[in-house]
Regions:
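Phosphate-handling catalytic cores of nucleic-acid transaction enzymes
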Residues: 1-171
């Protein structure tokens, strides 16, 4: 997807009244309400000088995780176009986070990242990177530095299993 397509995905479609009627029945669910509020909070991080946060909604198939994420992204435009998935490189997600600065970052389907130790380590690095608000510092061919991506966002992600092995440990 090109950046032009992403920009065009931030658009109004339908009416506020129709959107409210669509989400109203789901607002009774605490998790849905929290994810929706998280989406609304993304542009407030800068104003309130608040840190980035990462919301991870996981559970069994058909639990409404993706539907909640799409509803949260529908606040801003076309959810299908604004949502990405974990079948991405760290650099790709870094550049998307920079592009989405001050807006929510929706990432669906954690299981697409895979289950190998390499995949798990990469996934944990991605979570830390997004939460840190800055991409990797890279040199360029001329001896200088490339532009380093920076962002403020609320990342909202979904999956059918824990995002990290440490989150699945019983206490």
């Amino acid at each position: 997807m090109s950046q032009k397509n992403l920009v065009n995905a931030y658009c109004q479609s339908g009416s506020y009244e129709d959107w409210k009627a669509m989400v109203q029945p789901h607002r009774e669910r605490n998790k849905f309400r929290f994810i929706l509020a998280s989406s609304f909070s993304a542009p407030l991080l800068k104003i309130l000088k608040h840190r980035i946060f990462f919301v991870y909604n996981w559970g069994g198939s058909k639990g409404g995780k993706t539907a909640a994420l799409k509803s949260a992204l529908s606040v801003w435009g076309e959810p299908e176009a604004l949502m990405m998935n974990f079948n991405a490189t760290q650099v790709g997600l870094e550049r998307m986070a920079g592009f989405y600065c001050d807006l929510p970052l929706g990432i669906d389907e954690r299981q697409l990242a895979g289950n190998s130790l390499y995949s798990q380590n990469s996934l944990e690095k991605i979570v830390y990177m997004i939460s840190g608000g800055q991409g990797r510092i890279r040199g360029n061919k001329g001896g200088g530095l490339q532009h380093t991506q920076q962002w403020r966002t609320v990342a909202i992600a979904t999956g059918e299993e824990p995002i990290s092995t440490s989150t699945s440990m019983e206490i």
